[in-house]
Amino acid sequence: MEKYQKATQNPLENVDNVKIESENAIPSNLQAFTKSLAVLDDNVSEFRKRMNHLSATKQILDNFNESFSSFLYGLQINAFCVDYENAPLSESFLLQAKKDQFKATLMTRTGHSISDPPYDGGVISHDPNFATADETFATNDTSFIERPETYSASR
């Protein structure tokens, strides 16, 4: 609060308080404006400090913006350049539409619904009681198991 009061003081209010040694003596301009110039100097130095802080903040934000935009650009280029193995292809959508149509015709003919094979986070059940699942992306090419179990019909 004291800084605010100091900054809002009227710099000309103390001009009349300059001591005059004799009635006929005229104070010099420097003596009359000494306090006003001191207040002005304090305010200008405070303004300079704040502008320096503002400039430093702007530089920090510019550095962040440059780094963050580079990161976003890298993500965008990565999306164009990387071939995602598990991404659905246009044929996958066509196969799903055909599968849904086939299910609908079977349901109208038999009167009951055919459920999807159970999905437990990447492993598709090979239970023969379920309808054939779309195994377009169910490969074990990247598996750490060299010889996976073979499923037999006797299970």
UniProtKB/Swiss-Prot annotation:
Keyword match Zinc: no
InterPro entries: DASH_Dam1
Annotated compartments: Nucleus; Cytoplasm, Cytoskeleton, Spindle; Chromosome, Centromere, Kinetochore; Cytoplasm, Cytoskeleton
Processing and modification events after translation: Phosphorylated by plo1 at Ser-143 during prometaphase and metaphase to promote chromosome biorientation. Dephosphorylated in anaphase.
UniProt keywords, alphabetically: Cell cycle, Cell division, Centromere, Chromosome, Chromosome partition, Cytoplasm, Cytoskeleton, Kinetochore, Microtubule, Mitosis, Nucleus, Phosphoprotein
Disruption phenotype: Leads to mitotic defects in a proportion of cells, including an increased time spent in metaphase, abnormal reattachment of chromosomes that have become detached from the spindle, lagging chromosomes, unequal chromosome segregation, and ultimately cut cells (septation without chromosome segregation). Sensitive to thiabendazole, thermal stress, and osmotic stress. Simultaneous disruption of klp6 or klp5 is lethal and leads to the cut phenotype (septation without chromosome segregation).
UniProt keyword annotation of Ribonucleoprotein present: no
Cited Pfam families: DASH_Dam1
Effect of residue 143 to A/D: Resistance to thiabendazole
Modified residues (Phosphoserine): 143
Gene Ontology biological process terms from the UniProt entry: attachment of mitotic spindle microtubules to kinetochore; attachment of spindle microtubules to kinetochore; cell division; homologous chromosome orientation in meiotic metaphase I; microtubule depolymerization; mitotic metaphase chromosome recapture; mitotic sister chromatid biorientation; mitotic spindle formation (spindle phase one)
GO annotations of cellular component type: condensed chromosome, centromeric region; cortical microtubule; DASH complex; kinetochore; mitotic spindle; mitotic spindle polar microtubule; mitotic spindle pole body; nucleus
Transmembrane segments: none
Subunit organization: Component of the DASH complex consisting of ask1, dad1, dad2, dad3, dad4, dam1, duo1, dad5, spc19 and spc34, with a stoichiometry of one copy of each subunit per complex. Multiple DASH complexes oligomerize to form a ring that encircles spindle microtubules and organizes the rod-like NDC80 complexes of the outer kinetochore. DASH complex oligomerization strengthens microtubule attachments. On cytoplasmic microtubules, DASH complexes appear to form patches instead of rings.
Function: Component of the DASH complex that connects microtubules with kinetochores and couples microtubule depolymerisation to chromosome movement; it is involved in retrieving kinetochores to the spindle poles before their re-orientation on the spindle in early mitosis and allows microtubule depolymerization to pull chromosomes apart and resist detachment during anaphase.
Similarity comment: family membership: Belongs to the DASH complex DAM1 family.
Protein's name according to its UniProt entry: DASH complex subunit dam1
Gene name per UniProt: dam1
